[in-house]
Amino acid sequence: MKYLKRYVHLARASKVLTVILCFASIAPAQAEGLRDATLRPGWLANDGSYYTALDLTLSKGWKTYWRAPGEYGYPPKIEYNGSTNLQKAETIWPAPIVFGSDNMKTIGYLEHLVLPIKLTPIDAAQPIKLELSAQLGICLDICVPIFLSFSQQLDPLQQSADPETLLALEHKPVPRVQSNLQNLDCALTPHEDAILITIGAAIPSLGAHETLIIEYK
């Protein structure tokens, strides 16, 4: 059994959720570190949902962040304002990696990210006109924000799945019931102006080392 202890200050801890993880316009001043940003070809899946993906390519050594980037990361923000025939959009984050030292860790992706997006239409017989805006942080020695905007039309006749998006979907974190994680327990204890979170879990060997990520919401 491995244990992780973490203090969370009360101002940030109104709710706690634990997650175990075994056309684009770009301002010229933002181009440093960013090699390319596009939307992957979209398609209509058998369940009536559309899939597309944000494809981000960074310069060598540059990183971008996961949905919960850690204390020192830059939280991403993705919005769909102005889209038509769109009932729901779900961003499906692939499993990330952990960067940095023991005292300053961040969570994200190195040099390339394909970020799948599942879109539920209001009327499945009509196309979706997608308007997507994204605010992301990219980092080498220092971190800088980038602002992206895309337009894409997804038509019911588009039914050929994009292989890059499918590959990214295969790397999404799995629910606990589908993992080999055993004997998971979590305790929250008040401690002065913070909450002490203690987590214990039997983590199967994945190779060199295993990382436990706590996501706060």
What label would you give each PLM region?
Residues 3, 18, 48-49:
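Generic hydrophobic alpha-helical membrane-segment signal
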Residues 1-12:
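N-terminal secretory signal peptides that target proteins for export/translocation
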